[in-house]
Amino acid sequence: VEPKNTKEEFKYLYENVTVEKKGGYLGHPDSVLLKDGGILVFFPEGHGKGKTLSKISRDGGRSYTEEIKNPPKSWENSRETPTVYRLEFSESDTPDKLIMISGNPIWGREKSRGGFDCSLSSDEGKTWSEYESFFTEKDEVTHYPIVALSSLTRLRENGKFVDKWMGLFHERDFVNYKTVLSFSKDGKMMWTKPEPYFSAYRDIEKKSQMCEVECVRS
């Protein structure tokens, strides 16, 4: 609700914008600010699960008229809410990357291959890699993440930012896990074995049904 006497320069903050209209439910968007000022939005074609769709705004969010051209074929098989983050590097001359992630939870009685899928862009979202999957039923460690990753936070070591990012996700029993992303010398993604993040507070975590945790740097 727009407060009374709102200054004209701030009125746009209270405008409602329809990003997309399609048959059925659309929701759970996530967005990232592009270096040229554009806003790239991802959302599923369905309630939580469904083909990953995209829209781009070039006017500060007032309208969304573009979308990613020729998206990866694997995006059609997404099974969870997509999340997107910017990765900035300081330990190498690697340019920024964008990473989009979508989990593979168990939906009712539907079978799931588990794990989460990652797609990368090295050109500010113009082109993207096909999904690469981690912690699926074919791997030594299997998880069925819900909202992977609800948070992806760059880490520090000895007071300096390093090229590592801590991701969080949860499963149906409301256990929240952390896993750390890094890249090999040849640019391949590496994720550490997920570990329970709030094990010392499991009673609280379970009772409160803690989920979709966001980590904010203070």
Short names for language-model regions:
Residues 1-218:
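Asp-box/BNR beta-propeller blade signature and adjacent active/binding-site loops
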